[in-house]
C-alpha cells in the first residue's frame, strides 16, 4: 500500500499462480475434490489431473506447479504446500527450493551461519516421502505429512526444509507429530500443527500429543476433520463435536445443533458441514459471504478456506461462496484519506 501526496492510496495486487483462472475453475464439470492452498484453490478432476488458480507469494513461485501431475486420487495441503496421492499409492509434492529456519536456530547461530547450516542439513535429511508405497490417504500438518496404509497402519515424515523443526538424521518432526509407527487398526488420520490424530475402526481416538480426558470417552467417532490447530469430529449419529476448538470470536465452534452430517470442512474462522442429503450449512465469520451456502444442493464434497467455501456437486461442478483470499485486493486506487499532521 502506498499513500500518495494527494491523499489517495495505491494498492498492488499479489501475483497470480496456477494453471487456470478462477473463471475456468468455476466452469469445471468433472471435479471430485477441492483443497485450499493458502490463497490458491486446487481442484482434482476425474481424469486424475489437477487444476488450480489463485495468488502466490514470491517465495511460493513453484508451489502451485502441478501441470505434470497425473493419476492423482486425492489432494491435501497445509496452506503452503500441495500434496497429491497417486493411484499407485505414492505421493507427490509441489516443489519447494527454499529453507525454513526456526526462530530458536536463528537466535542461536545468527542469520549467516543458520542459513549455511540449514542448506547443509536439508541436503542430508532423508526424503522419506519419496519411498512411500501403498498409501490410501494423506493428511498434512505444519511440519509433517502422515499417510494411512491399506493395512490400517500409518507412516509419517517431516519436511527436510524445516530446519530446527525436523531431525535431519531421521527425517521426522521434532515435535513428536510423526510418532505414529505403532498405530494399528486405523480408519482415518488427521495431521494438525504439531499434532497428529488417528481414528481407529472401533470409533476411538489416538493422538501424538497429550490425550484430553474427554477424548477417552469417545467410542462412536465416525470421521475427523480439521486444519492447523483446529479439529472436529462427526459421531455415528451424525452429530458433531469439536476436538480442538478454533477461535470462537465469530461462532466457529457453534456446531452442537448439527445433525445428519457426513463431512466437515474447517476454515480460518468458519466451519462447514455437509449433510447426507447433499445440503450444506456453515457457521462462523461471514465477512466475504463464505457461509452463504444454505441454497446449495446435491453436494458431495466441501472445502473451507480463509474467505471462501467450495462445494463439489454430484455432476462435478464447482460452487464458490465467498472469495479467494487474494481478492481482497480488488481496487487499485482507494479514495482520498486524511492523514493527521505530525
Show where each model-derived region lies.
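Glycine-centered loop/turn positions within well-structured domains
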Residues: 144, 162-163, 195, 229, ...
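A detector of tandem-repeat and repeat-rich interaction/domain scaffolds
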Residues: 252-266, 271-275, 279-286, 290-304, ...
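Conserved core positions of repeat-based scaffolds
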Residues: 1-2, 11, 40-43, 52, ...
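Repeated scaffold domains used in trafficking and secretory/extracellular systems
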Residues: 30-34, 38, 71-75, 79, ...
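Acidic surface patches and DE-rich sequence motifs
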Residues: 4, 45, 56, 86, ...
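Short glycine/serine- and acidic-residue-enriched loop/turn motifs that recur at repeat junctions
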Residues: 3, 10-27, 51-68, 92-131, ...
